[in-house]
Amino acid sequence: MKTMRFLSFLLSVVLLLPLLSSCAEAPQSYVAPEGEAWFMGFASEEIPLPETDDPLYIAGYRQGKEITGVLDLQRANAVWMDTGDAGVLLIGIDCVGLGSDTVNKIREELSDFCRQTNCVSVNVYATHTHAGVDTLGLWGPIAVDGKNDAFMENLIHAAVSAAKGAYADRSQGKLLLGTTVPEDLLYDSRRPQEYDSTLYQLRFVPDHADQNGIRLLSYAAHAESLRGDNTLLSRDFPGAISDGIKAATGDDTLFLPGAIGGLIMTRELVDEPFDATENLRLTGEALTKAVLSIDSETELFPSLSIASEKVEIPLDNTLFLCYRFLGILGNPAVDGDGETGYSLVSELGVLALGNVTLALIPGEIFPELVSGNGLGAEDPEPLSAIARRHGIENLLIVGLCNDELGYIVPPSDYLINPDAPYLDGIEDATGENHYEETNSTGIRTAALLAEAFEEILSLITEPRG
């Protein structure tokens, strides 16, 4: 049914495609002078619901499903960081994902602020809650943009306000790395069973006791503990962790989604019949308890560097093409060698904080592409191996950052329906469902991002033999 609906308007969309040219840009990088201390600040802004009668569609599972109530409102959280020179912003939005067009609007709104504060890089990512308002446009009725314009304006305003507040909150302190492994909480819904079960914490401890501490928490799981029947607005477990840490310690929290493709989820912690809000409560409590259990930390030397590169991703997915030219997806499209004749312009980045490097990935990357476990000969070199060659000791993933390309799938395990490519899913010979490919740009995305990762690392590190 879905296939026939989209095929009915595909031809008319293609006939209206504009002719665009390539817009490749040189990589950008900044390496801060040797610092004596860390400077960080945090701010958080609620994203209010618009006072309109226009529908608010929930982001995930089914199209055209409207939000019926509120558990907790989405927020924009921001952290400023520097080592005494130019600064960097990380802005985390409690939402399912953001296209590069929305990210660029936030950057444009902050352009004067960045000049005034010597901010060299603004990076915006989504925590990937599936209980938020549709911010990508994919969950409206068929062929209808699911985004609510007024809500998107509120989101951008909250992100900008949080960014400015984070700078105003800037204070001096030290930065510590700690880890823990929450017990039996994750599972992978697709073979191979590969995921990173470690919860990583970067904890900023201010020199003055009157300043709040800041915790950056990286964990690789879809934020969907409320599951698919839910129609209540919520930040899901990233919000529950933030609230729990605040109540227990007074510290502020910025949640970073890791390598969640594949599809990595938290287990259900309640018995039948399933109680969504109770499952959220238990998941949040389990993760908060895990964070508070971290008792061994390593202090990071105050060094900061960042690099990014525009990447042209061949667009093979005809459904994404339709969304793009119906105005649902706002990613820039250029002439390219994708099966559609186009490429999407995206962005990959790296942020090095002491001996910890954050890979800023524009989508939901499969964990195999990071660890190397379960990869085949046709797959790119895993990001962890590339990082090791550049002397990187600790590699963390920040998914859905500065763009949302969908799932980033290993080529060796990439399968599409030959009768309805990207429109309908397919099972392989083992019965494995290859759903994720229908929400991906194409088979070459993983390799191109790995190449870009190598290139931008070379701007801020010295490769080892």
Regions found by a protein language model. Give the residues of each.
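Bacterial N-terminal signal peptides that target proteins for export
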Residues: M1-L10
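Conserved beta-alpha junction segments in alpha/beta enzyme cores
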Residues: P27-Y125, T129-T288, D295-G465
